[in-house]
Each structure stands twice: as structure tokens, then as C-alpha cells.
Amino acid sequence: MQLTELIETTVTGLGYELVELERTGRGMLCIYIDQPAGISLDDCEKVTRQLQHVLTVENIDYERLEVSSPGLDRPLKKLADFERFAGSEVSVTLKKPLDGRKTYRGILHAPNGETIGLEFEGKKGEAAMLDFTLADIDKARLIPQVDFRSRK
């Protein structure tokens, strides 16, 4: 079983989604998990303990294991991610330029089949629409929306 498959099976078996897996040159494994209700420290601890056990049993070599939430600027990789975060502000970088640019920032529209829509500000300030598929994307991330005003 491949490392990604092993980790994804373990993470989903615990009720979480594997967002991303990074393996650094120094033997560090970084695992990013999520669920609709968000991720707590207890969630990270639970997944860490289970993965430590599984990686030991499977004799997978690593120096350090880090499990965390994907953060406010989480990557969007699967069609389900684009569905879940429809209506959110995102940044999308395409593999090939379209109309002379590769990076777009705008409001995500829910996928229609395999096609994903992004409403962005066009050249003359008017609203424009970009339609793309997962195959067109180099990377896509949520744009963090942070409100520092106090809630009174």
C-alpha cells in the first residue's frame, strides 16, 4: 500500500478528510486534516496517535510526524472542496495562461458537473466569469477572511 493511501485510509477511518500530505527531505511527515466542524487540538492528537501506530506497524521510516488543520488559506484540490467552499473568496493559479494571465482571485461558484466557475473583476472593472476544470488548475487556495472587530 502506498504511503498516501495508507494515511488517507487511516485518517478517513477516524472520520476526517486528508487535505494534504507533505514529506520533507529531512524525514518529516506533515499531514493536514479537516472536517466540516473544523479541527481541534484533540482531533490532531487523536490522528497523530493512530498514525504513529500504523506507521510503526507498516515499518514506514520517518523522523517527525506533524498533524494539523489546513489553516484559513487551505488548498482546494478535489471537486468536493470546490463544492463545499462555493461562495468563498479564492485564489486560483492555472497551469496555462488564459487571456494573458494565470492567477485569478474571486468568488467561487459551485461546480456544474466537472466545470468550476470563478467570478472575478475583469480588465475594465466589470464582473467576469472564468470556467475551468480540476485539470486546468496548478493550485487553488481559500483567501482568509479575518474580522478583527470586537463582537459586542
Swiss-Prot record:
It is found in: Cytoplasm. It comes from the Bacteria. The keyword Nucleus does not apply. The keyword Cytoplasm applies. GO terms for biological process: ribosomal small subunit assembly; translation. Keywords: Cytoplasm, Ribosome biogenesis. Its main location: cytoplasm. One of its GO terms (cellular component) is cytosol. InterPro entries: Ribosome_maturation_RimP, RimP_C, RimP_C_sf, RimP_N, RimP_N_sf. Required for maturation of 30S ribosomal subunits. Belongs to the RimP family. This is Ribosome maturation factor RimP. It comes from Burkholderia cenocepacia (strain ATCC BAA-245 / DSM 16553 / LMG 16656 / NCTC 13227 / J2315 / CF5610).
